[in-house]
Amino acid sequence: RLLDLASRHGFTCTDVKIFNSKSHWGSCTPRRSINLSLSLMLLPWHLIDYVLLHELCHTIEMNHSDRFWALMDKVTEGKALELRKELKKYHML
């Protein structure tokens, strides 16, 4: 799914790793390696996509600047903040 979203939106990542993280849904390293939590499996598909797109956006903007959120809005069809709020309702196991 990550590679499909990356291709569809023009992102590239160098590596993908799955961890049993209890503190992050995902992260992106400066080398464009994306780390994902196993807990993502508990989320609805649209929120999994949100997290994947969030980390893919970090391959371009390694921060949460206005440019990052503009990019997130572009790839989520203007729903970035709405999806972010919805994700906060979920807790990691």
Residue ranges, per PLM feature:
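Active-site-proximal or metal-binding-adjacent scaffold patches in catalytic folds
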Residues: 1-50, 59-93
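Walker B catalytic acidic pair
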Residues: 55
